[in-house]
Amino acid sequence: MNSSEIREKFLKFFESKGHTIVASSPLVPGNDPTLMFTNSGMVQFKDVFLGEDKRPYTRATSVQACLRAGGKHNDLENVGYTARHHTFFEMLGNWSFGDYFKRDALKWSWELLTQVYGLPAEKLLATVYIEDDEAFDIWTKEIGLPPERVIRIGDNKGGRYKSDNFWMMADTGPCGPCSEIFYDHGPHIAGGPPGSPDEDGDRFIEIWNNVFMQFDMAEDGSVKPLPAPCVDTGMGLERLAAILQHVHSNYEIDTFEALIKAAGRETNTKDLSNNSLKVIADHIRATAFLVADGVIPSNEGRGYVQRRIIRRAIRHGYKLGQKKPFFHKLVKDLVEQMGEAYPKLKADAQRITDVLKAEEERFFETLANGMEILDAALAGDAKVLPGEVAFKLHDTFGFPLDLSADVCRERGLSVDEAGFAAAMEKQKAAGRAAGKFKMERAVEYTGAGNTFTGYEHLEEQATVVGLYFEGTAVPSLKEGQAGIVVLDTTPFYSESGGQVGDQGFISAEGVQFGVEDTQKIKADVYGHHGVQTQGTLTVGDKVKAAVDGARRAATMRNHSVTHIMHKALREVLGDHVQQKGSLVDPDKTRFDFAHNAPVTREQILEIEKRVNAEILLNSDTQARVMDIESAQKTGALMLFGEKYGETVRVLDIGSSRELCGGTHVSRTGDIGLFKVMSESGVAAGVRRIEAITGAKALGYVQDLEAVIHSAAAMMKTQPAELEPRLAQVLDQMKALEREVGALKGKLASSQGDELLAQAVDVKGIKVLAAVLEGADVATLRNTMDKLKDKLKTAAIVLAAVNDGKVSLIAGVTADSIAKVKAGDLVNFVAQQVGGKGGGKPDMAQAGGTDASGLPTALQGVAAWVGERA
């Protein structure tokens, strides 16, 4: 019974018992921020059990995709080395929300296992909580399981109700006994029954757990009955499949067998028992499903777990000799195995492939160098990988710690994890020191707020009222020291609303402080962060504060155009467009906004047209300060979720009116040219546009013009005539391709006539297996049709090799398909050249990657046909 049939039978069985089939929920839990990944079937029903949600059904069943690779539930290091550890697995489950209870749950479990799946009753045994007499009696008196095969499990975890057979959602709240069903693999397998000293052996394998939530536990450990007891059951699909398919390891079941073969194909590994293939097969399931559910590789949270799994798989491929991206190629094989059960996997196949390929390409850039360093560190008599080396591998080469630990474990060594943690903390401390001026809470300032004059002036006479070195107030800053300066008055704009802080200088005679950034210490106190480049600066000094004017002007252009672009986006795409984030600096504007589809090229052109039209109007910019109620009456655009004070600044730029405290151009014409550089998606329902203005935009256009002139020169035409000239050249190329195709057809036809004489008679069937030189797939197919017509009763295989890739076509005449199927024939050859294929009984196609096996494969065709004729 294959995995698809197991899923189908499970769901249909419980549907027949009045259960509603519920689709698998995403691997990212939508109702539990404390849980990194969905790790059991009950996760999507947690709110129902807690009484916080009510469903239109009281009985449910599902096949849930689960992941255990992070936090408390982490099987990553064991995956590939044991028979039953996985990162990704499927959980079959059924639930009762105050409906049926123990009797029905246990009886249905028994009925499904013994009557539907056909497991021998004598191979099954059960466990119950030591005080659960009700469950014991159901098993022994109603189901008929012999008492010696129902094992009572006591409090084996150090307290009352602390047992393998007593389930608790948390320290308090819903809880209850559970009854587990085990399968006995027989005395030839080492291990004892549950509850015995040898229970960790492989003889007795848990396949199903029935949890009965019937109590509410108080803080003092006492329990009282729940008003509506519930049932939560779970059975691992992979474990059940191993039993039903008569194999001992989960990695031998149908889905894994196919993926392991695919991993062997992509890594050119013939030994399919290699543990690295198991790792790769497991990890393609986990990573592909994670991408489908929106988890992209990153350096934090769920994204980092995803990155760790991908890179572990890549490292195992590297261990098998792979030096180029291979892992992403397994997505198509996974879709073949699981796409029907999980339609989202099938629908997102290309996106999943692209994400995995990009991560592979990134890691392969540093993998070889990192492995050299790791190998060198483990050479000789070393028993432990130094923590500093493990951290260097992590920080410089992208090696997650568990990847380095994986390599060490294979060699019987260990990693100095404490040393790694110390090195990590050292770097974080250095980062905090280098970026201390960004950490507002590290500076305590109790003086008066400063006056900001930067809307009107770029220079200001001021007095130093505060100095900070390493987060502590000091009377002076000496030359070479990095610190923070607070002035009573400042023209420097402090980072806010997406606009970066100003840079410039604070100076007096013989004294200069270079301002590298400006950040708020408090709402009305600006901290000027930088380095004392000359002399000593002292509290009370009279200074000149001067903003870098060119940098400020470039930033203002980009900030002002962001407002105009926001208005244009709403006009072109719709009023649903809403700002989700922005970054405005001297080089560009980056604007994130709510929109559920890519912005088309035509829409971008329209947005550019509208923005540049506003710029050409050269209208005045107007800023007004008013109370929030008055601002609302003006119709100014306000951002949902943004917190505004009682007094706000309303900014009119062109036809745009928004609340904004940033610095802006005086007239729209000051922006100059506006050009969109890129458009992309950054999250579900969020798009990002990056754009440039002024001299940057002009330079970009001039660079494009230079490329056009260069291309025109290559095509020996003028820039204005480049498009028709390219169309002409493409037409000529297509004509030449058709001519080449015709010549190939003639050549193949000639070869086909010559091949007729090579056909051999095998039990009345003309058998021909040959290579057509220089042929493509279309030529092979055309030649096949002609040969079938001429040979009449025949089984034919034609092959061609192009760029090391093998193309195969098998054809069988109608009077022979009862004995020989084209699909079987082409697969016989394809398997020997590293490929696979399929098709109809009379015509099938395949491809392969190992041309060296082709001669032998073709030589064996006649004998293969003879065995079936």
Curated annotation (Swiss-Prot):
GO BP terms in the entry: alanyl-tRNA aminoacylation; negative regulation of DNA-templated transcription
Record's keyword annotation contains Glycosyltransferase: no
Gene: alaS
Cofactor binding, per record: Binds 1 zinc ion per subunit.
The protein's name in its UniProt record: Alanine--tRNA ligase
Keywords: Aminoacyl-tRNA synthetase, ATP-binding, Cytoplasm, Ligase, Metal-binding, Nucleotide-binding, Protein biosynthesis, RNA-binding, tRNA-binding, Zinc
Protein task: Catalyzes the attachment of alanine to tRNA(Ala) in a two-step reaction: alanine is first activated by ATP to form Ala-AMP and then transferred to the acceptor end of tRNA(Ala). Also edits incorrectly charged Ser-tRNA(Ala) and Gly-tRNA(Ala) via its editing domain.
E.C. number(s) listed in UniProt: 6.1.1.7
One Pfam match: tRNA_SAD
Main location group: cytoplasm
Matches recorded under SUPFAM superfamilies: Class II aaRS and biotin synthetases, Putative anticodon-binding domain of alanyl-tRNA synthetase (AlaRS), ThrRS/AlaRS common domain, Translation proteins
The keyword Cell membrane appears for this protein: no
Domain topic, free-text comment: Consists of three domains; the N-terminal catalytic domain, the editing domain and the C-terminal C-Ala domain. The editing domain removes incorrectly charged amino acids, while the C-Ala domain, along with tRNA(Ala), serves as a bridge to cooperatively bring together the editing and aminoacylation centers thus stimulating deacylation of misacylated tRNAs.
Entry GO CC: cytosol
InterPro entries the UniProt entry points to: aa-tRNA-synth_II/BPL/LPL (IPR045864), Ala-tRNA-lgiase_IIc (IPR002318), Ala-tRNA-ligase_IIc_anticod-bd (IPR018162), Ala-tRNA-synth_IIc_core (IPR018165), Ala-tRNA-synth_IIc_N (IPR018164), Ala-tRNA_ligase (IPR050058), Ala_tRNA_ligase_euk/bac (IPR023033), DHHA1_dom (IPR003156)
Compartment(s) of residence: Cytoplasm
Enzyme class: ligase
PROSITE patterns xref list: AA_TRNA_LIGASE_II_ALA
Entry's family note: Belongs to the class-II aminoacyl-tRNA synthetase family.
